[in-house]
Amino acid sequence: MRGIGGRRAEYRPIISVLTDSAKPLDVARAFRDRLGLRECYLADLDAIAGSAPQLETYHAIQSLGVRLWVDAGVRELEDALALDRAAVHTLIVGLETIAGPEALGTICRTLGPAKVLFSLDLKQGYPLGACNHWEGADARTIASEAVALGIRRLLVLDLARVGMGDGTGTVALCRELACRHPELELIAGGGIGNAADLKRLQENGVNAALVASALHNGNLMPEDWRRPWSLAEHAKSAE
């Protein structure tokens, strides 16, 4: 689906210069064959909304030799274990859906910090989630608590920026988090529109980037992330 500003009711099938198909398997194959990407981020919107994860789709994509990062609306350890059994490469635990810090800590301890990526979900800069514990907390506080729980991989994602192509809007936050928590693998996404956005993120302590629309519309090509300053080894693709 083509994400637009986090307004999921307005999401539409992807239109891409890379493939005529909007099916996840075909899109992943195009990322691999046309762009040389070997890792793919997938947001399972139905699972995030409470439906069962689309495990068959995950397996099909992974059969291409593509390592899959999946956000499937993990709430508790049981949800995370189901994705682990599906051999998902990176399990994304989103602030939007996680039951609370206790569940996050349990998942991190059980599966290990290398497997778990905590998504600091924001909307227009404000934390997005149903957890009472973090109600009213700012993004920096939540990130620090996540680190204290064992998180070592953090995604900063402002859903209001998704698909807009005007930058992530989180550069200052990322810079502060990188300074406060140098042990973090810090990833940013939402709104990346061109190579200049990648460069700006790298200059502010970001280790990797999630990109979708800029790949589908041709604004970013492999030569853009293979520049000496780029996030080449970490560039991820998003669906």
Task: Kindly give the residue locations of the regions a language model identified.
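Conserved, mostly hydrophobic/aromatic
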Residues: 40, 83, 118, 154, ...
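Charged helix-capping and loop-helix junction motifs
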Residues: 52-59, 132-141, 166-175
